[in-house]
Amino acid sequence: MNFSRILFFMFACFVALASVSAVPEPRWKVFKKIEKVGRHIRDGVIKAGPAITVVGQATALGK
């Protein structure tokens, strides 16, 4: 019986420590998601820039 109390106490302490995080999560995660989408769009435009230039030059040669 004493062992089960000790085991229960250790389990309760483990659950309490596991549920506490050192860094609090921001309340406005929506803005972080919007920022992430904007970053992806910006990176896509930067990567597509040289390809768009080549296509523009190819159409200029075709005229």
From Swiss-Prot:
Question: What Gene Ontology terms for biological process does this UniProt record contain?
Answer: antibacterial humoral response; defense response to Gram-positive bacterium; innate immune response
| Chain positions found as Leucine amide | L61
Q: Which residues form the propeptide?
A: 23-26
State the signal peptide span.
1-22
* Compartment(s) of residence: Secreted
Q: Do you know which InterPro entries this protein is assigned to?
A: Cecropin
Coiled coil region boundaries: none
Single GO cellular component term? extracellular region
Keywords, alphabetical: Amidation, Antibiotic, Antimicrobial, Immunity, Innate immunity, Secreted, Signal
Please tell me where this protein is predominantly located.
secreted
What's the family? Belongs to the cecropin family.
What exactly does this protein do?
Answer: Has antibacterial activity.
Q: What is this protein called?
A: Hyphancin-3G
What species is given as this protein's source?
Hyphantria cunea (Fall webworm moth)
